[in-house]
């Protein structure tokens, strides 16, 4: 087994707790906060969050958040399409309050990062994540990726997981690997026509498409008896519309194929 894949395996009890917390937090997709009836008092460290930009080798500005003690174990969050690092805010606050250093970045063309016309593929996503990890000198990090972010994590671990000690564990939440697209070798995948529909909807009316997705299947608000939280829908829409239409269009191929 390649040594770069070993961090994906063999969770200790402590690692399992991190994984379970991340899975629960991501699966709920902020529903817990939406349903909260009592204030939650988090034990957050003093000093305040920090943020900044990292410049990649191809001159792309990648926005990042870096919260918590710099000597604590880092947990690095990788967001899904077409969102930003803001999608992990609730989870970052949770782990920050439990003593971890938490880091997240906006993928190129997403959020506050540069809106460039190229490099919207998994290889570049992983390279950009590596640029952030290098700039912040992250080691022994737990990488958590949701959806497209899961593909980014898998590629990051394989391509940039060495030297030993850089990556402690990887958590893939509802991730895209190994392949979403239906092919002869992947007959249970999603037909290409579905992704073509995404492209058509995005190109014709991105704003409405990004309203319909969270209002319907993304949070399960289209299910019978579901309680709809308008703030969550608007926050999803806000994150999506911050990014580049070109990055989002190209990203459909990146996450599906």
Q: Where are the model-predicted features located?
A:
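Conserved HGGG/HGGXW glycine-rich cap/lid loop of the alpha/beta-hydrolase fold
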Residues: 60-115
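N-terminal secretory signal peptides
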Residues: 1-11, 22-27
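Active-site loop/oxyanion-hole signature of alpha/beta-hydrolase fold enzymes
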Residues: 57, 97, 104-148, 158-164
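Conserved alpha/beta-hydrolase catalytic His-Asp/Glu region
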Residues: 178-190, 200-257
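Flexible "cap/lid" loop of the alpha/beta hydrolase fold
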Residues: 154-204
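N-terminal cap/lid segment of alpha/beta-hydrolase-fold proteins
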Residues: 40-61
